[in-house]
């Protein structure tokens, strides 16, 4: 059976909302929140546990929304900035989906089948998840993954 961890990006692995003036930046189509956000966790530790889970057969998917009401040019810039963020911090993933704001995230990973866990900070998104279970990213994601790894 496929086992899939589906991560949101903004507010889950990247502290996007911790960037001063993030909303004003987005309204001005400025990618700074995407380029300056810090990781929520020690990425070395996160990479280690995710790579161990991948060795145990889990797939890691990042499914993230683009900015709300953005132009095509800004969407393109956001895609590039998010990709560079993931590369800069070495977040290990098997698939990456950057989709229009509000897209049902389950539609991005449904084809993978199996047991899927969505890790997201948005309650509405978690409540709409239909492919398995969810974990609230406002809690300690790293501890959750360690427990998943060691069956705790």
Listing of model-derived features with the role each one plays in the protein:
Residues 63, 98-101, 137:
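Conserved beta-strand termini and adjacent loop/short-helix elements that scaffold enzyme active sites
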Residues 14-17, 68-73, 104-108, 125-128, ...:
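Short catalytic/ligand-binding loop motif for oxyanion handling, primarily in non-cytosolic enzymes
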Residues 93-115:
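Donor nucleotide-activated moiety binding/catalytic core segment of transferases
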Residues 1, 54-55, 109-114:
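Flexible, charged surface loops at secondary-structure boundaries
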Residues 114-152:
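Acidic, Mg2+-coordinating phosphoryl-transfer loop and its flanking beta/alpha structural elements
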Residues 10, 66, 102, 122-123:
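Short, flexible active-site-adjacent loop segments at beta-strand->alpha-helix junctions, enriched
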Residues 4-6, 10-88, 93-95:
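Alpha-helical substrate-recognition element adjacent to the catalytic core
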Residues 48-52, 107-111, 128-131:
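A short acidic, amphipathic alpha-helical/loop segment
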């Amino acid at each position: 059976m496929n086992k899939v961890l589906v991560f949101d990006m903004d507010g889950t692995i990247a502290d996007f909302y911790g960037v001063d003036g993030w909303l004003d930046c987005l309204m001005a189509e400025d990618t700074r929140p995407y380029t300056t956000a810090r990781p929520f966790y020690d990425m070395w530790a996160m990479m280690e546990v995710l790579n161990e889970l991948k060795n145990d057969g889990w797939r890691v998917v990042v499914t993230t929304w683009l900015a709300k009401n953005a132009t095509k040019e800004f969407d393109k810039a956001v895609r590039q900035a998010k990709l560079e963020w993931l590369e800069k911090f070495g977040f290990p993933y098997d698939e990456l989906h950057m989709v229009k704001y509000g897209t049902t995230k389950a539609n991005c990973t449904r084809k993978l089948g199996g047991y899927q866990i969505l890790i997201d900070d948005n309650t509405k998104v978690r409540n709409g998840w239909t492919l398995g279970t969810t974990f609230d990213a406002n809690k300690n994601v790293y501890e959750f993954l360690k427990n998943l790894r060691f069956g705790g």
